[in-house]
Regions:
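Ligand-binding pockets and gating/stacking loops
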Residues: 1-187
Length: 187
């Protein structure tokens, strides 16, 4: 851990880089005419098998870090936030109920958080089945009702101005995905 922290320090500085300062810098770079089109941030700590906590736990800490990234990107982007899409990505969801260690296990369904001016509106877009046991996958997980790849393919199509079918073919190997662009993004 100490080697990682020191490797992220600027020579002559006592301040190590963190996602918040990187997000601010990334926002400033992304808004440049010839700047990059994509920035990627990693937020760990969501694999909370034990001691997940509530408003004070490690899960909350990770969500606060995500919020800081969103805020600093917006600050760095300024008015260019109107032409921006922020998309979160995860490899797994979490179970609904806590385990005996006050954490959660890997789950089936999940959520994708998005922000930015390219979104059609503030919304929860879902085919929500509910939280009753009969509605859960294997009586423990959110049921996955929308293929996350449909969201990602639609986002790529919108942001990079590439035909959805082309993204579907070249990135997702012609899998049967739903184009959600008209439901999620401004035209």
């Amino acid at each position: 851990e100490i080697i990682y922290q020191r490797s992220m320090m600027k020579k002559g500085s006592s301040m190590s880089r963190n996602n918040n300062s990187l997000a601010l810098k990334a926002g400033k770079e992304l808004k440049k005419i010839n700047g990059p089109r994509v920035a990627v941030f990693e937020v760990g700590g969501f694999d909370t098998h034990a001691a997940q906590g509530g408003i004070d736990g490690s899960h909350s800490d990770s969500l606060i870090e995500m919020d800081g990234i969103f805020k600093n990107l917006e600050k760095g982007l300024g008015n260019e936030m109107d032409n921006t899409l922020i998309v979160t990505l995860t490899e797994f969801g979490r179970t609904i109920k806590q385990n005996s260690g006050l954490g959660t296990e890997h789950g089936y369904g999940s959520a994708i958080f998005m922000g930015g001016g390219l979104l059609k509106k503030s919304q929860v877009y879902s085919d929500w089945p509910g939280l009753k046991n009969k509605d859960l996958f294997e009586n423990r997980d959110l049921n996955s009702t929308i293929d996350a790849r449909s969201v990602y393919a639609s986002a790529m199509s919108k942001v990079f101005d590439v035909d959805f079918k082309e993204v579907q073919k070249e990135v997702f190997w012609n899998d049967n995905l739903q184009n959600l662009s008209d439901k999620l993004f401004k035209t």
